Structure formats: structure tokens, C-alpha cells
Amino acid sequence: METLSGLDSQGGYSFKKIASVTLPILFSMLMEYLIGMTDTAFLGRVSEVALGASAMGSVYFLTFFVLGSGFAFGAQILIGRRNGEQNFSSIGPICYAGGFFLILFSLLLMAFIKFSSPAILPGIIQSESICAATIEYLDWRLYGLLFVFITAIYRSFYVGIARTAVLSWSSVIMVFSNILLNYGLIFGKYGLPEMGVAGAALASSIAEGIAMLCYIGYTCKRVDLKKYGFDRIRSSLDFSILKQVFQVSFWMMVQSFVSVGVWFFFYVAVEHLGERSLAVINLARTLSGLPFILIHSFATGGSSLISNLMGEGKAHLVWHLIRKVLCFAFAVVTPLLIFYILFPELTLGIYTDNTALIRDSVPMMYVMSAASFLQIAAFILFNAVSGTGAIRAAVSIEFCNLFLYVLMVWIGILRLRPSPAAAWSVEIYYQTLTILFCILYLFFGKWKEKKL
């Protein structure tokens, strides 16, 4: 039995509360997914080189972006814990300290990407045409780092205090801005220059800047700044607060960076199989993005609620919450994966009109769907471990899995040179290991006494 207060009969969070936190996250991520979908749809009609370059550039950019998002996720865990403790006035200083750090960090990363990419990428991307287009893409995409890092700390604040409605409408504005700019800058419409793959990058960066302004405006107008300690900007400059945030966030940054770095290594390995294989993998990446953001929204919402439960002193209800989130996620994601399996050609046709590419990509759809099904449990359980505050345990689990993942990519792809579908099967092994290790830790680890 569930109550209207957001609690069920056991004192844990109800399905209604889970939905109220998760669905705005889900909607915002669906909107953001449209950015990648429109990039693929537009660039797929430019050339396979443009499609491959956007894939390589996006993953390379993501490798740096996750450093900031990992830091912000650590801040979110702290914010959720303080919110559960009802220590509201300490939340603002956490946001300020995290925000100041991320602004400086983004500027350093932008400079690094600008000056290092022409030296690094030719050594790892075999195709000269894809390499040149990737560098062109990054020259414009890197400016979005500042905007997405600032936005990340705002998202952490709203997810941490379980007020996620703002995520929805800000994402709608960002996506519509991106679609219009994409069409104009890729193909030279609306009087804008025809920039091709660089236009897709610039459109994304501008759209992210617009989203950042939405968060700033909403926070100034609709949030009780005094309640959450946003009037304590001087105390936020205290190094001890940044140190506290860093103790939690540092390991999330490392885990996120290494995880995406390994994923980039996977793309580099596939690129060595040829431009067609990379194009197939890029289609799979785009299609797997939709189930992933569904899964990610449930995992993020669940992690926030777990942090709040821990702050309320209700660690004994964490497993009860995990089971509810898992049931909810499987009910939502599984029908989509069944559709992928039953209608692969129809789904692929949304992204490309190349019949040969569609034919070669069909086997990939089956493998990708199986991996995504396992990812439902894997990602939710992994974020549950992080939500308890057991950051080092989560990082240890990830590093162990990634070591095995790299071995499988090295041997299974670079040495054996399989089909794209067989190459993607390493995801199945990775998700299975994540499920196993997370369950073992949640049953036998000492996370219930974790203090932050």
C-alpha cells in the first residue's frame, strides 16, 4: 500500500515518488537524446565519413565531459545526503564550491583539447579523412564544455533535492535550439554557413549554452536561495568545503574518465576494422542511446533517493527501493528492446537511407538489444552502490570490469577482427560482471554504516 506523501507502508519511497523524481530526468534525457539522433540523421545524409567523424568526436569529447559530470555526480550524492538530513543550508556552499571548480577545470580541458587533438588523434585513428573531420568537429565542440559543466552542477542540485521538473523544460528548449541550428549549420540553411560536421558541433555547443542560461534564470527566480545557503557565497570559497566535495567526487571523476576512455578505445579498435564497421557501430551507439537514457534516468533517480534514504537513517530500506526501481525500469525498457528485435530494418531506416548499411547493421541490433537488457540491472545496481556513498567500492568494481573489458577488446577485436555484431558482444560480458559484483557488494559490503 502506498501513501500520497511519497512513502509506502514500510516507510520507504513509493512508486509515485520514484516516478515524480525519475520521469522529469527521463524526459530531459529523451530530449537530449534527440540531439544525438538529429546529428546522426543529418550527418548520415552527408557522408559515412561525416557520420564516423561525429561518432569519434563525440566519444572523444565525452571522455573529457565525464570528468565534470563525474565530479557533479559526487556533489549530487552529498546534496542528497544533506537533503535527507534536512541540513538544507549546507547545500548551496556545496554547489558553489563545485561550480567554481568546474568552471576553471572546463577552461583547462578546452585548452588541452584544442592543442592536443591534432597531435593525438592521427596516432589512433587510421582513416585520414575521418581523422581530419574529427579534429574539425572538436574545434567547435570543445566550447560546449564550459556550458555543460555549469549545467551539470545545477542538475546535481535539483536531482539531489528531488525537484527535477526543471530538467524537462530546459531540455526541450535545448533540443529545439539544437535541431534548428543543426539544420541551418550543417546544410547552410536560414542564411547560415554550410559547415557540415563542424556545424553539428557548433549547434550542440550553442544549444548547451542556452540550456545553461535556463537553469540560471530558473534558480534565481524559483528557488529559496536563503533556505539552501546560496546567500553564503563567501563561506563557499572555504577550501574545506571543496575538499569535502572532492573526497566524494574525485573517485567518480576517475571512474567516469577511465570508463569512457575504455569506450573510446573500443571505438578506435572498431575503426581499425574499416569505415563501414565504424558506421555500423555508430548506428548501434545511437540506437542503444534510447534504452540507455531510459535506464540512466531510473538509475539516477534511484541513486538520489538512496542518498536521501541514507541521510534519513533508513539504510535498511535501500534494497526495498532498489527492487522497486528495477521493476519500474524493466517494465519501461523491455518493450522498446522487443520492438528493436522485431523491426530492425524499420528502426535503422530512421537514421540512414543506405540499404547496404541497413542490411549490415541488422545482426548488430540483436546483440545490442541483449546487452541493453542486461544493462538495466547493471546500471541501476552500480548507481545504487554509489548512492550509498560507497564510492571507492563502486570504483573498484568498475576498474575490475574495465580491465577485463580491455582484454576482451584487445584480443576479441584487434586480434580476431570480428564482425561489428560480434565486437559489440563484449558489452554483454561487461554488464554481466557488473551485475554480479554489485550484488555481492550490496549483500556483503559494509555500506550501511557509510558516513559522508
Model-derived features with residue positions:
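Small-residue-rich hydrophobic transmembrane alpha-helices
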Residues: 51-114, 148-162, 166-167, 280-342, ...
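Short runs within selected transmembrane alpha-helices of multi-pass transporters and secretion channels
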Residues: 72, 76, 141-159, 167-178, ...
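Alpha-helical transmembrane segments and their lipid-water interface positions
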Residues: 32, 36-39, 43, 65-72, ...
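Interfacial/gating helices of multi-pass transporter permease domains
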Residues: 43-62, 94, 128-133, 197-198, ...
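Transmembrane helical elements of multi-pass membrane transporters/channels
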Residues: 20-39, 140, 174, 207-211, ...
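Short alpha-helical transmembrane segments in multi-pass integral membrane proteins
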Residues: 1-22, 79-146, 192-249, 306-371, ...
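Helix-terminus/linker motif at the lipid-water interface of multi-pass membrane proteins
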Residues: 30-52, 121-128, 184-195, 257-290, ...
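N-terminal transmembrane alpha-helices
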Residues: 9-41, 45-46, 62-74, 78, ...
